[in-house]
C-alpha cells in the first residue's frame, strides 16, 4: 500500500515539477504551445521510464504518433532545459546509432524532496 501511495506522490510531484520548470522558466522565442507540448511529453516520458522502456526517438514516435521532427523539437527543448540528458546508443538493429534520453539527476532529486515533503 505504501508503494502505491509513494508512486502517486511521485507522479503528482512530476506534474508540479514539469509545470514549474517549463511554464515559470520560458526559453526566449518559445511559444505557449511549445511549453504545453513539453509538459505533455514529460508525462509520456515518465510513464515510459516507469515501464522500463528506453527513451528513444523511435519509441516516443511509436507511442505518441507524432512526427520525428515534432518529437525532436520537443525533446531538444527538454534537453536544453536540463530536464533530460542525451546519449548515443546502438539502434535496435545494432548497426547505427540511436539518440537515447534519460531524466537528469536533478529531476529525481526534485521529486525525492517533493515526495518526502508530501509523505510527511
What are the functions of these language-model segments?
Residues 114-120:
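Helix-turn-helix/homeodomain-like alpha-helical modules used for DNA recognition
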Residues 34-35, 56, 89-114:
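Short, cationic-aromatic polyanion-contact patches
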Residues 79-91:
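A short, conserved structural fragment
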Residues 47-52:
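Short helix-capping/hinge SLiMs at alpha-helix to coil transitions
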Residues 11-43:
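Short alpha-helical segments that sit at the start of domains
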Residues 1-12:
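General nucleic-acid-binding
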Amino acid at each position: 500500500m505504501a508503494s502505491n501511495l509513494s508512486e502517486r506522490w511521485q507522479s503528482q510531484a512530476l506534474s508540479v515539477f514539469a509545470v514549474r520548470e517549463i511554464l515559470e522558466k520560458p526559453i526566449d522565442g518559445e511559444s505557449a504551445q511549445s511549453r504545453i507540448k513539453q509538459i505533455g511529453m514529460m508525462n509520456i516520458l515518465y510513464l515510459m521510464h516507469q515501464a522500463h522502456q528506453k527513451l528513444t526517438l523511435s519509441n516516443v514516435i511509436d507511442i505518441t504518433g507524432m512526427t520525428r521532427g515534432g518529437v525532436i523539437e520537443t525533446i531538444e527543448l527538454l534537453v536544453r532545459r536540463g530536464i533530460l540528458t542525451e546519449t548515443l546508443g546502438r539502434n535496435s538493429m545494432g548497426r547505427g546509432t540511436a539518440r537515447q534520453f534519460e531524466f537528469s539527476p536533478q529531476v529525481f532529486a526534485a521529486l525525492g524532496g517533493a515526495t518526502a515533503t508530501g509523505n510527511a
